[in-house]
């Protein structure tokens, strides 16, 4: 090394996000996962669930989390999550309420399809400091309408957010309109057991301001033209929010209850053929 015959890996190593698009080859399932990690978050995207975010750690809070004898965390050194499909289940436990996940639903004439039920594959690219996941289009079949939809997910270095873009590529009836519901179900913690949610505040900012102080009453509020929907979680010093590209979209927040304590943030919008709708999931330190 000192003679210059070999390159020291550490001297050339840059501080940049770590990411990996992983495909299962061990069991031959052909499933794909994408992991992204930077100083603001760690996230996992599951292509077998239509590009849903199934793991999210809000590093933006920069928690002090002492571990060991004499601290509040004698053994548990895990950083708290907002979404975790193993400990907080995921889409496939919705029979018991809702598991934690960041996904979207399409509705048409009383029928509803969650993109978690639309397995696909993704391709990775990078433009400047933005890592991009481009998912293969999925076809959603309603009783009398077929919709072809493509998802792109953007991870911009240093932005502390994830942009998710839905593009309606084709409809069997070009004049039809469907309702797109972009949602995030979350519940903080480090284990499968729920933490106390009673100090969480859910809020909608926009033409009308709505606030829910968490009391496990399963309440919901919505505002058309919402600028932002958010949740503040004091215990982990985290503020998580969603914003949308369309100023006319309806933002909503939903409170959980004792046996399904997760909160929900989301946007609903009527969308038509060839239309694109984007939302951002934003993470910040609460104070």
Could you tell me what each predicted segment is?
Residues 34-38, 202, 218, 229-231:
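Short acidic-hydrophobic surface loop/beta-edge motif
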Residues 42-44, 62-67, 137-149, 173-177, ...:
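Short, surface-exposed beta-strand/loop "edge" segments at domain boundaries and coil↔beta transitions
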Residues 40-47, 147-155, 227-246:
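Broad, structure-driven detector of short, well-ordered beta-strand segments within folded domains
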Residues 27, 39-40:
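Extended recognition/assembly regions associated with phosphoester-bond processing machinery
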Residues 1-32:
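C-terminal domain-boundary segment and adjacent tail
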Residues 16-19, 26-28, 163, 179-185, ...:
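Beta-strand-rich recognition/accessory modules
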Residues 42-141:
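Acidic-aromatic substrate-binding/catalytic surfaces of carbohydrate-active enzymes
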Residues 55-59, 138-152, 157-206:
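Acidic (Asp/Glu-rich), glycine- and aromatic
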């Amino acid at each position: 090394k000192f003679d210059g015959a070999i390159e020291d890996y550490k001297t050339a190593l840059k501080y940049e996000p770590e990411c990996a698009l992983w495909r299962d080859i061990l069991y031959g399932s052909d499933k794909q996962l994408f992991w992204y990690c930077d100083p603001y978050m760690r996230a996992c995207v599951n292509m077998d669930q239509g590009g849903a975010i199934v793991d999210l750690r809000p590093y933006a809070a920069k928690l002090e989390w002492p571990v060991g004898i004499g601290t509040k965390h004698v053994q548990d050194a895990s950083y708290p999550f907002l979404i975790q499909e193993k400990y907080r289940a995921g889409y496939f436990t919705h029979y018991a309420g809702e598991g934690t996940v960041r996904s979207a639903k399409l509705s048409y004439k009383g029928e509803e399809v969650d993109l978690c039920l639309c397995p696909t594959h993704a391709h990775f690219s990078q433009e400047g400091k933005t890592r991009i996941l481009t998912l293969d289009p999925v076809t959603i079949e309603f009783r009398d309408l077929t919709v072809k939809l493509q998802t792109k997910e953007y991870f911009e270095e240093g932005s502390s957010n994830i942009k998710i873009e839905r593009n309606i590529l084709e409809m069997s009836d070009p004049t039809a309109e469907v309702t797109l519901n972009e949602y995030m179900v979350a519940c903080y913690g480090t284990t499968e057991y729920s933490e106390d949610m009673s100090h969480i505040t859910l809020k909608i900012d926009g033409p009308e301001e709505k606030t829910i102080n968490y009391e496990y009453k399963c309440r919901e509020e919505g505002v058309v033209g919402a600028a932002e929907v958010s949740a503040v979680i004091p215990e982990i010093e985290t503020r998580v929010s969603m914003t949308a590209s369309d100023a006319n979209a309806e933002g909503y927040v939903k409170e959980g209850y004792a046996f399904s304590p997760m909160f929900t943030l989301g946007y609903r919008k009527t969308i038509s053929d060839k239309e694109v709708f984007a939302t951002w999931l934003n993470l910040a330190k609460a104070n």
